Amino acid sequence: MRSGVFVAVLVVVVFALLTQGQELHVPEREAVANLAARILKIVHAPHDAAAGVPHKRNSELINSLLGISALMNEAGRR
């Protein structure tokens, strides 16, 4: 799945560069190269390492997105 995402992002970046390559300045080109390198690092990393991305359980992700952890901490203090 990660390979598919990488290929899709890479295709989008390549097409964007081909169509607007003359409009990109040096900082923008460096940003594109940096993002491509990060995506490549994530794709080629072992599944459990995920290139230094901290592992969170699904419940932790949901709670952090909904802000439930802050509410639970406040409720626990009462």
Curated annotation (Swiss-Prot):
Residues recorded as bearing Alanine amide in the entry: A75
First-listed, main subcellular location of the protein, grouped into a coarse class: secreted
Keywords, in A-Z order: Amidation, Cleavage on pair of basic residues, Hormone, Neurotransmitter, Secreted, Signal
Zinc keyword on record: no
GO CC aspect terms: extracellular region; synapse
Protein's GO biological process: chemical synaptic transmission
Tissue: Eyestalk sinus gland.
Domain of life of the organism encoding this protein: Eukaryota
Residues annotated as signal peptide: 1-21
Single GO term (MF): hormone activity
Compartments where located: Secreted
Purpose: The pigment-dispersing hormone causes the migration of the distal retinal pigment into the proximal end of the pigment chromatophore cells and thus decreases the amount of light entering the retinulas. May also function as a neurotransmitter and/or neuromodulator.
Family of this protein: Belongs to the arthropod PDH family.
Name of the protein in question: Pigment-dispersing hormone 2 peptides
Naturally occurring in which organism (per UniProt): Callinectes sapidus (Blue crab)
Gene: PDH2
